[in-house]
């Protein structure tokens, strides 16, 4: 699964706990590899904004996944005190925490694997997929496909979550294939349509008043 905020893959984890027959969930990151580092080493080190890379799979340009704590809660036996220690005291004091020993071993026991993909690898995967299957995929899906293939046992089915239309990432598709992707009919001429928006101050009460007046 292409992974940024850990939402889709956390949903897969919950679905598996409910009985969906999934052998492994593969977490694919881009150059912002905080989650890949955790699954490989047990070390969780959220990055500051200045350390977060701008990439060609921008929905995955996240260095502190808001859904991740939910998974670690399950991973550690739903031990609320331990979660408060890790995500409260340790993260606040050191900016990171590390699972070792039995706690780290639980990651593999929970059926998780991970990997990361670079811009060059995204472009190569988009190109290869178009050549082999006559299918154009977006950069995030390319991240998921590249990493998923690395962890796929021979003969086992691989399901890759497609997360966006390639049309939204025309520059990367053009780099990979030499042409922009075809647009769905509903998007033709969208740039020429009227744009409607309101600028609000960074004030929660102003946002509430706006919603009350317009929704």
Which residues fall in each region the model found?
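PLP-dependent amino-acid enzyme catalytic core
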Residues: 1-215
């Amino acid at each position: 699964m292409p992974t940024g905020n850990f939402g889709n893959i956390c949903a897969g984890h919950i679905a598996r706990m409910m009985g969906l027959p999934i052998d492994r969930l593969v977490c694919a990151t881009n150059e912002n590899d905080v989650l890949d580092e955790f699954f490989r080493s047990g070390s969780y080190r959220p990055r500051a904004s200045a350390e977060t890379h701008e990439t060609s799979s921008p929905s995955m340009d996240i260095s502190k996944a808001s859904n991740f704590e939910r998974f670690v809660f399950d991973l550690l036996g739903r031990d609320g005190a331990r979660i408060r220690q890790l995500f409260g005291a340790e993260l606040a004091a050191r900016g990171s925490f590390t699972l070792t020993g039995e706690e780290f071993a639980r990651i593999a026991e929970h059926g998780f694997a991970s990997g990361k993909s670079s811009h060059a690898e995204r472009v190569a995967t988009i190109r290869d997929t178009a050549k082999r299957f006559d299918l154009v995929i977006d950069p995030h899906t390319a991240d998921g496909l590249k990493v998923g293939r690395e962890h796929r046992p021979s003969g086992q089915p691989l399901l890759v979550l497609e997360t966006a239309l390639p049309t939204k990432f025309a520059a990367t598709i053009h780099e990979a294939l030499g042409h922009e992707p075809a647009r769905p009919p509903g998007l033709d001429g969208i740039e020429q349509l009227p744009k409607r928006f309101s600028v609000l101050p960074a004030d929660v009460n102003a946002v509430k008043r706006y919603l009350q007046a317009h929704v």
